[in-house]
Amino acid sequence: MLTFSFLTLFPELLAPFAAEAIVGKARERGLVDVNLVNMRDFAQNRHLKVDDTPYGGGAGMVIRVDVAERALHSLPPADEVILFTPAGERFTQQVAEELAGRQHLAFLCGRYEGFDARVEGLVTRELSIGDFVMMGGEAAAACVLEAVARLVPGVLGDPESHQADSFSSGLLDYPEYTRPAEWQGQPVPEVLKGGNHAAVAAWRRAQALERTWRRRPDLLPDAGLTPQDTATLLELGVSQEELDVWGAPPAPVKRHRKRRPETTESAS
């Protein structure tokens, strides 16, 4: 079982994410657990104050490192102690897959002006969900919980559900359709209704390649492109120069079957 421990000043912000939908069901089945730790419980003062003014002056308040340390020491040993910070490593699908293999993850969710810099000595990893600033780490924590928990074996009903997701294959996901078969003049592609699984798989791969090329071409160098992918991208209008930059393999060589020469029987 994978346990998520979130150290926060506002556990009520994370409680719904831990109790509802797929994560909530996974907790009921004993596949994951979520531990919400209120850092105010470790303040050791009458007013439960966890922050103080910054040395050197400046606006805002800074969360004390001794409070964070006591909160961490109240937990069982963690495989990773993670701090959410704009300076951290970018959180990606690859990182999510790595974290899903752990047993216990502890997360420090900051507020105000963040933590005393000495908290860096308590953490094993720093993560960022993007180049923007929020009011606290709880929203980032919810993102990581959702992304990692769904990768734990058994959490999703279909064990292959996440393997075709955007980024898991190195590409953006292909478009999905359901009923009605036609809506406001927009029909479901015929290939999806024909029952030919090989044709459906080829169509989906081509759609994923096109979406990625048009929207996130930066993903293609690391997407593990195949020779058939190269052929598909060339048909879409991608130049050979771009493909070379991405390290794409050569497209398959189309072999034309040679016609056997006609033979004439000699007259007897």
From Swiss-Prot:
Broadest EC class assigned to this enzyme: transferase
Positions annotated to bind S-adenosyl-L-methionine: 110, 129-134
Reaction equation(s) it catalyzes: guanosine(37) in tRNA + S-adenosyl-L-methionine = N(1)-methylguanosine(37) in tRNA + S-adenosyl-L-homocysteine + H(+)
EC number: 2.1.1.228
Signal peptide: none
Family annotation (SUPFAM superfamilies): alpha/beta knot
PANTHER family the record matches: TRNA (GUANINE-N(1)-)-METHYLTRANSFERASE
Assembly notes: Homodimer.
Role description: Specifically methylates guanosine-37 in various tRNAs.
UniProt protein name: tRNA (guanine-N(1)-)-methyltransferase
